[in-house]
Amino acid sequence: MIEGVMKEGFITTSYDSVVNWAKTGSLWPMTFGLACCAVEMMHAAAARYDIGRFGSEVFRASPRQSDLMIVAGTLCNKMAPAMRKVYDQMSEPRWVISMGSCANGGGYYHYSYSVVRGCDRIVPVDVYVPGCPPTAEALIYGIIQLQQKIRRTHTIARV
């Protein structure tokens, strides 16, 4: 992040680096727990793993207060429009983590008539966390991967 430090105590860096650093340390997730993966998501937020160390301290109930949606579980056809509506209500910039094989591709219920075969058919997904259910460590690794992806984005358009 820091390109140079002068003797007087000044730090020189780019605006993009500062803004992206701030974004990575203040992810406000909104839980979209649909099945058993949500239990592992709660486990990741508990005292043992404490995702607050990575800037995801408080799970928000309102989409207007969150910038990260964690989709955890099986998405059915009737729930898909509601999920899209919640995603559209989130403020920009917004990110999505697909957690578990059911959210990634339908999981065990892939061939069911009522299951969406991956939440990426409804909302754009930034990070996929595999597993059935994925462990809390896997979710934390997914959050770290998302933070690295955010650091690589450009806030200001280059001409």
Curated annotation (Swiss-Prot):
NDH-1 is composed of 14 different subunits. Subunits NuoB, C, D, E, F, and G constitute the peripheral sector of the complex. Binds 1 [4Fe-4S] cluster. HAMAP family: NDH1_NuoB (MF_01356). [4Fe-4S] cluster binds at C36, C37, C102, C132. Pfam families: Oxidored_q6. PANTHER family: NADH DEHYDROGENASE, NADH DEHYDROGENASE [UBIQUINONE] IRON-SULFUR PROTEIN 7, MITOCHONDRIAL. Its EC number is 7.1.1.-. The gene is nuoB. NDH-1 shuttles electrons from NADH, via FMN and iron-sulfur (Fe-S) centers, to quinones in the respiratory chain. Couples the redox reaction to proton translocation (for every two electrons transferred, four hydrogen ions are translocated across the cytoplasmic membrane), and thus conserves the redox energy in a proton gradient. It comes from Delftia acidovorans (strain DSM 14801 / SPH-1). It catalyses: a quinone + NADH + 5 H(+)(in) = a quinol + NAD(+) + 4 H(+)(out). It is found in: Cell inner membrane. It is a peripheral membrane protein. This is NADH-quinone oxidoreductase subunit B. Keywords: 4Fe-4S, Cell inner membrane, Cell membrane, Iron, Iron-sulfur, Membrane, Metal-binding, NAD, Quinone, Translocase, Transport, Ubiquinone. GO terms for molecular function: 4 iron, 4 sulfur cluster binding; iron ion binding; NADH dehydrogenase (ubiquinone) activity; NADH:ubiquinone reductase (non-electrogenic) activity; quinone binding. The keyword 4Fe-4S applies. Belongs to the complex I 20 kDa subunit family.
